[in-house]
């Protein structure tokens, strides 16, 4: 597998989430936490969005983080001038190239190339130390020849080009094929960034395929928040990559902080962490079926793709249910210092199953039954 970096966009894409209304202090808290976690880039809202957005960009850029603070702006000279003045370490330009977005802004491909070069040239002269990325908005609904013409024209002048699945329609195969083609056009010097929306549930798979094909940067947000259904979630992306590059991922990021990041942003935007959320969801490491419970007691790797403790969470064994088995009951009894013969173990297991048929038992109720069974 290739090396890659994360551009976390919780403070840009995430601010476009319906329920998000981050204060300056919220943004500072998120940025510092992401920096401690090990995120390489933190993307913030365009400073031309509002007076407060500009102030926030300046504050975040001045924090002295290890992560590079970058801002995301439309490819316009006026926006670029403001972005340079904020002191950010990177400027991410975007220009719509699909027929839908060209109809909205009224430029054809030659005009897009001309204006992009003008804005890039300004940034290079005004702030030569700043990283520049150019992204074709709505990449995957753009004509391929148009895309490649734009990327080829700007590649000599930028550090990175971006591919954006703006409405989440791309398939993993499409992402792989297009990233490979863009890599061929821009050459080995220019980095490639992937930004994938999750409207059709492919954001994580698409991010992975982008890396497989040669992308070097992937955009994420905490909990995947963003416009509409959001984008590639940080936790989900790391779950995917950990199964393939465990040592690499563990070396780069302070993974045990992930629950803290998810809780923090959930609190700030007023939502609950989904029960089935990657890694930090309530049921992410729950085991209930008897066959699963037996295997987990013997070797957790049998039914877990990664150890929960790596990410600072714990597994949950649902022993007191109709699906339980004698191996799970025996293991729980032994944890309580209780020991049954084979016949008694079978009988108490069947008794617990019958009780659970009438309603879910709590662990406390199970423990009471096991203790009383010994003394009965």
From Swiss-Prot:
Domain of life: Bacteria
Disulfide bonds: none
Binding positions for 2-oxoglutarate per the UniProt entry: 12, 72, 133, 166
GO MF terms held by the record: citrate synthase activity; homocitrate synthase activity; metal ion binding
Thermoactivity: Optimum temperature is 60 degrees Celsius. Activity is rapidly lost above 70 degrees Celsius.
Pyruvate carboxyltransferase domain: residues covered: 4-259
Binding residues annotated for L-lysine, in chain numbering: 92, 135, 166
Regulation: Is highly and competitively inhibited by lysine that binds to the active site and competes with 2-oxoglutarate. Is also slightly inhibited by arginine and 2-aminoethylcysteine.
Pfam families with a match to the protein in the record: HCS_D2, HMGL-like
Effect of inactivating the gene: Cells lacking this gene show lysine auxotrophy, which can be complemented with alpha-aminoadipate but not with diaminopimelate.
Amino acids binding Mg(2+): 13, 195, 197
Family assignment from sequence similarity: Belongs to the alpha-IPM synthase/homocitrate synthase family. Homocitrate synthase LYS20/LYS21 subfamily.
Documented EC number(s): 2.3.3.14
Location of the protein in the cell: Cytoplasm
Cofactor(s) required, per the database record: Mg(2+); Mn(2+)
Chain's gene name: lys20
The protein's name: Homocitrate synthase
